[in-house]
Amino acid sequence: MKVIVFLLVLLEMQRVIQNQPFPGTGELPMTRRPPKRELEYWCTYARSCDFCWNCRHGVCKNKVFEKHPLIKKNDYIQICRVSRYGEKCSYFTDSKIRRFHIMSCTNPTYYDWFDELMQVKEDRIIDVENIKHTCLCMVATIALMVYIRKQYSRMRMQAATRLLIFLGIYLLLGILMTNIIMNLPLSTDNPMQMRRPPKEDLKFWCTYAKHCDFCWTCKDGMCKNKVFSDHPIITQNDYIVNCTVSRWHDRCMYEAHFRIHYQHNMNCSQPKDLEWFIELKRHVINQDDL
């Protein structure tokens, strides 16, 4: 009976703690939908999360900040999960690359995971020394594995112990191979994501993503096309915008970072030109529909 009473008291205390005004030391279990009273907090520091937006007909309006401009529904808005334990608040996004951020609930720091995700270095630096070191570790690991295999019958260990040893070795090999791959240069045949495509790919991208900044050389407000010499010189303006390009096997994609992030997917072998800038300018948002 005492145990039951004790459990009831604990449940009541938990309910009281969860109802405390935010921020506080109360716990918030991992959830996709934080309490309504906490939305302003979360949407200030995790502004890309889906629970901060109302989307309709492909156009999204911020739930908390009325003055926030309308945006087009795209990859900028991600499914998020948030939690709070003690004085630590955290959120992570279910994007292609998961982003996890922990911050102090009382002194939080803004973290724009989307900008970091899109900021890929123009030129990847190949860490030759790291690759050499990793290769030596791989050779040593393989030699150790061969030695263990030869001594397998002499080992006086249980089958489960042997299995764990081999699993550990294979895991180590996997980590070493991943380290090598991450330090290798990007190949034009491999999946990539970058702000500046390789020079040999410029003609392709500048044919179909002709408004992207990597296609132009600008000086004193005048811009000249890098690829097509017969293209007339144009004035530097909103026509030229920052872009991110990516290729995943047979699918090519570029995203223009305009006021509204605009994304276009196409077949790499049979691409289709899209005048995204003209379409974007013609895009009329009826706020009454939101």
Curated annotation (Swiss-Prot):
Q: Which InterPro entries match?
A: ASFV_fam_110
UniProt keyword Glycosyltransferase, yes or no: no
Pfam families hit by this protein? v110
Q: Which residues cross the membrane?
A: 1-19, 128-148, 163-183
Q: How does it sit in the membrane?
A: Multi-pass membrane protein
Position of the signal peptide: none
Q: Which family does it belong to?
A: Belongs to the asfivirus MGF 110 family.
Q: What does this protein do?
A: Plays a role in virus cell tropism, and may be required for efficient virus replication in macrophages.
- What is the name attached to this protein's record? Protein MGF 110-9L
Q: Native species of this protein?
A: African swine fever virus (isolate Pig/Kenya/KEN-50/1950) (ASFV)
Higher taxonomy: Viruses, Varidnaviria, Bamfordvirae, Nucleocytoviricota, Pokkesviricetes
